[in-house]
């Protein structure tokens, strides 16, 4: 069970009375809640999302769905399938996969959008599946995009998607919520992309890792919806699980414009749904709690560029322009910045100019509808006349697929969202991220540069960004620590119902793996990932092998791993969770976890706890000790009935005692059933 320190709040205290906007939307889509239960950060809830989108991974989801014994999608109006990732791939194998997805969607009556229609996230916005104040999920990390229109969008893994297809629901733990205040107004030439690139660069110490974000402040009201979508989209790269903007007049105007294009009979964007937004919108309570409060002054922001090869590195364009960084390729593609306003902005820069002879410039619209609008406006032809190479609407180079990838030694600048090493081609290439305007200007200049440089004008120096971060002690989000004694009421009264078959307590010796960012390959080596015939005993033997070959000789059944921050980062391999279970370990504790690992853990019946203070205490105790795996002699007991964790040494002296969030019966049921797949099978059997 994934619980941050700020989640350590007794559910009976008045501190939990107010709800923020994220919690209120989850409240709407949570099912099977106890009477009068208000949901808050840290709570595990069963959710029935308004919609669930999958893309090229729809066939693996369908295969898992059928493997569970499911025959029919329970609510075909909930599900959307789009083909967008590998649309340039015309091989027999890929076309067969696409045909399988289309056939399955037709048989099930699922809304289906074929290759060429556009990127799934853009379609979800255009067609109103992701709509203000609803909860929409997708088996893709950039589901955060939906927050740009006030829809709580968050990613799920394939097992979750199969569960939703079969039962209409899955589970979610409400993350800590960070308030990000945008103050002031953007200067001319500064865009939404500059906001999020700057945020990723100036708050680059995982301040919002695994948080939900709510954007507030007077700076929000003047941001176009396309800017909001760009910002929400890249909250993924910032480390967040969602990025939610408020409902305001500008958003309602956006939907009125969509209504004019779609006509009066659209099932999701129509007069009734827009009028419902006008009549009353959800908003955070005055006493809502936030884990932290970040502020950035938009008046002090200038055009920013991310990279190379990291979103945590960002610099003012004025600095990089002086460095004369030659480029080989430029990209105006992706769900981040290929909407009509982006294409028009690039066209305005390119008009009357030609792409530099040493540069290849690729352009793809976010959807076929966007391309049609860009063609009608003349912007598309302007970009093509300048020398850009058109690609079909889809993900393409952003995901490292198809034409125009970066080669060894090349430098690229892109309006996309990720510039990780090797993401857009060769691992020996350098990738930068910037706004459509800067990408277009760089394509003309042959180097990273600003639009004004095309006309021979100097680039103005950038002011220092004014920013701040606050961790409010009075908010109740810091929870109870060992320096803040637990009350007698907290420790004596059992308040959590425990299902038959679920343990009332979990305990074991803490085994310290003293490192941050232990990735899934360190937990379960990649060379074993596709050995489908490997036994459970063999999985136990190789558990943590790449992290420490001695792990298997130092640990035993019922031990509890305690590690640093971002444990389980990396790939989506489920064996990273199941190999720990194979060793007889039921619980992992860490400072924080990679989100996909957290979901895979619960989905496979492995419990997790986030207790940052505990890892910090152990790091003090073992400072200077170079062993990778240490038996600490500290024992953790998690009393599930009291939602209380106690850590004591061999002599019984209490080292730490923490009140933790309640593990509800919904999650207990998944664990008892052996994971999410087992739970789904049991639900399907009930319907037979």
Swiss-Prot record:
Organism: Candida parapsilosis
PANTHER family recorded: HOMOACONITASE, MITOCHONDRIAL (PTHR43822:SF2), HOMOACONITASE, MITOCHONDRIAL-RELATED (PTHR43822)
Homology family: Belongs to the aconitase/IPM isomerase family.
Region (Disordered): 468-494
A Pfam short name: Aconitase_C
Residues the entry annotates as binding [4Fe-4S] cluster: 335, 395, 398
Cofactor detail note: Binds 1 [4Fe-4S] cluster per subunit.
Catalytic reaction list: (2R,3S)-homoisocitrate = cis-homoaconitate + H2O
Gene name tied to this protein: LYS4
Keywords annotated in UniProt: Amino-acid biosynthesis, Iron, Iron-sulfur, Lyase, Lysine biosynthesis, Metal-binding, Mitochondrion, Transit peptide
Cofactor: [4Fe-4S] cluster
GO cellular component, one term: mitochondrial matrix
Top-rank lineage group of the source organism: Eukaryota
Principal cellular location given in the protein's record: mitochondrion
Biological function: Catalyzes the reversible hydration of cis-homoaconitate to (2R,3S)-homoisocitrate, a step in the alpha-aminoadipate pathway for lysine biosynthesis.
InterPro entries in the record: Acnase/IPM_dHydase_lsu_aba_1/3 (IPR015931), Acoase/IPM_deHydtase_lsu_aba (IPR001030), Aconitase/3IPM_dehydase_swvl (IPR015928), Aconitase_4Fe-4S_BS (IPR018136), Aconitase_4Fe-4S_dom (IPR036008), AconitaseA/IPMdHydase_ssu_swvl (IPR000573), Homoaconitase_mito (IPR004418), Homoaconitase_swivel (IPR039386)
EC number per UniProt: 4.2.1.36
Top EC category: lyase
Pathway: Amino-acid biosynthesis; L-lysine biosynthesis via AAA pathway; L-alpha-aminoadipate from 2-oxoglutarate: step 3/5
GO biological process, alphabetically ordered: lysine biosynthetic process via aminoadipic acid
Keyword Ribonucleoprotein recorded: no
Protein known as: Homoaconitase, mitochondrial
GO molecular function, one term: homoaconitate hydratase activity
Keyword check for Translocase: no
């Amino acid at each position: 069970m994934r619980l941050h320190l700020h989640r350590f709040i007794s559910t009976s205290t008045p501190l939990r009375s107010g709800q923020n906007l994220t919690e209120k939307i989850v409240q709407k889509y949570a099912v099977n809640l106890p009477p009068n239960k208000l949901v808050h950060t840290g709570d595990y809830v069963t959710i029935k999302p308004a919609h669930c989108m999958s893309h090229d991974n729809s066939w693996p989801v369908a295969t898992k769905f059928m493997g569970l014994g499911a025959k029919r999608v329970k609510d075909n109006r909930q599900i959307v399938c789009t083909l967008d990732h590998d649309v340039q791939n015309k091989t027999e194998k890929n076309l067969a996969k696409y045909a399988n997805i289309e056939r399955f969607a037709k048989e099930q009556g699922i809304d289906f959008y074929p290759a060429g229609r556009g990127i799934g996230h853009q379609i979800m916005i255009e067609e109103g599946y992701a709509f203000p104040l609803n909860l929409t999920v997708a088996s893709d990390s950039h589901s955060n995009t939906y927050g740009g229109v006030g829809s709580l969008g968050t990613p799920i893994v394939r097992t979750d998607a199969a569960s939703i297809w079969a039962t209409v629901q899955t589970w979610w733990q409400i993350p800590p919520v960070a308030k990000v205040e945008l103050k002031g107004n953007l200067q001319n030439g500064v865009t939404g992309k500059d906001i999020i690139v700057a945020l990723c660069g100036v708050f680059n110490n995982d301040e919002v890792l695994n948080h939900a974000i709510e954007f507030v402040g007077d700076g929000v009201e003047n941001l176009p919806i396309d800017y909001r979508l760009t910002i929400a989209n890249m909250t993924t790269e910032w480390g967040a699980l969602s990025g939610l903007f408020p409902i305001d007049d500008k958003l309602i105007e956006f939907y009125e414009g969509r209504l004019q294009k779609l006509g009066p009979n659209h099932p999701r964007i129509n007069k009734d749904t827009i009028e419902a937004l006008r009549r009353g919108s959800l908003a955070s309570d005055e006493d809502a709690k936030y884990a932290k409060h970040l502020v950035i002054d938009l008046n002090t922001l200038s055009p920013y560029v991310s990279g190379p090869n990291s979103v945590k590195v960002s610099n003012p364009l004025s600095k990089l322009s002086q460095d004369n960084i030659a480029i080989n390729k430029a990209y105006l593609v992706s769900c981040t910045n290929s909407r009509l306003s982006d294409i028009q902005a690039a066209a305005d820069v390119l008009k009357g100019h030609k792409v530099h002879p040493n540069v290849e410039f690729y352009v793809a619209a976010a959807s076929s509808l966007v391309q049609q609008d860009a063609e009608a406006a003349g912007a598309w032809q302007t970009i093509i006349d300048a020398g850009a190479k058109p690609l079909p609407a889809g993900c393409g180079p952003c995901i490292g697929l198809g034409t125009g990838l970066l080669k060894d030694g090349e430098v690229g600048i892109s309006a996309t969202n990720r510039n990780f090493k090797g993401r857009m081609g060769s691992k020996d290439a350098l990738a930068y991220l910037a706004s459509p305007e800067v990408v277009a200007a760089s394509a003309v200049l042959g180097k990273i540069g600003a639009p004004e440089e095309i006309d021979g004008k100097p680039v103005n120096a950038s002011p220092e960004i004014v920013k701040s971060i606050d961790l409010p002690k009075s908010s109740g989000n810091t929870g109870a620590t060992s320096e803040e004694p637990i009350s007698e009421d907290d420790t004596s009264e059992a308040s959590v119902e425990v299902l038959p078959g679920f343990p009332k307590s979990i305990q074991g010796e803490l085994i310290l793996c003293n490192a941050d960012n232990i990735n899934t390959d360190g937990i379960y080596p990649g060379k074993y990932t596709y050995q489908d015939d490997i036994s459970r005993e063999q999985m136990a033997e190789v558990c943590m092998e790449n992290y420490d070959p001695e792990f298997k000789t130092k640990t035993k059944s019922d031990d509890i791993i305690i590690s640093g921050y971002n444990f389980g980062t990396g790939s989506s391999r489920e064996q990273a969770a199941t190999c720990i279970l194979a060793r007889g370990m039921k619980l992992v504790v860490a400072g924080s976890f990679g989100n996909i690992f957290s979901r895979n853990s619960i989905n496979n019946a492995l419990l997790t706890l986030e207790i940052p203070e505990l890892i910090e205490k152990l790091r003090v105790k073992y400072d200077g000790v170079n062993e990778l795996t240490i038996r600490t002699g500290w024992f953790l007991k998690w009393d599930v009935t009291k939602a209380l964790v106690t850590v004591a040494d061999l002599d019984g002296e209490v080292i730490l005692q923490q009140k933790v969030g309640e593990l509800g019966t919904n999650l207990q049921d998944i664990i008892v059933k052996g994971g999410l797949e087992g739970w789904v099978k049991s639900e399907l059997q009930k319907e037979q």
